[in-house]
């Protein structure tokens, strides 16, 4: 069985799926370019029940994202990098499981994955790597020409991640500076 590595080419991503990973709630957002505009195609959350077993919860995430890949011709998946704290190693391990099935869904769909640290997403969106969530939500609202600030936070974060993926994949100069 051969291994194929899929990588994104600069300037080649016109439909991007942004993912804010979580075992309980995974936020996702699909954006695409229509002429000079960026358009939000779909956004939402995939929720798993805390009462389900870990494999059942992971399957729920995988099935949900596989459905998104089946509906949209995604060119690139932008995934928030794992953030962990030494006080909560168990949380980091569980998040690693969630990120694993998210990456599996992308690989199964033949979609390349780019990983972005939360501070990088914030810097690309606002110029400040420590920007508060409210500032990120406002930036997303303005850049996608939305009527209101996106809610819940998982969806807003996924939108920001997809926008970051778009800007960095389509502008190599920004990628070098970010």
UniProtKB/Swiss-Prot annotation:
UniProt-listed Enzyme Commission number(s): 3.1.21.10
InterPro entries per UniProt: RNaseH-like_sf (IPR012337), RNaseH_sf (IPR036397), X-over_junc_endoDNase_Mg_BS (IPR020563), X-over_junc_endoDNase_RuvC (IPR002176)
Cofactor binding, note field: Binds 2 Mg(2+) ion per subunit.
CC terms in the record's Gene Ontology section: cytoplasm; Holliday junction resolvase complex
Catalytic machinery residues: 20, 80, 154
Broad EC category: hydrolase
GO function terms (MF aspect): crossover junction DNA endonuclease activity; DNA binding; magnesium ion binding
Signal peptide region: none
GO BP terms, alphabetized: DNA recombination; DNA repair
Positions annotated to bind Mg(2+) 2: 80
Keyword Metal-binding found: yes
Protein's recorded name: Crossover junction endodeoxyribonuclease RuvC
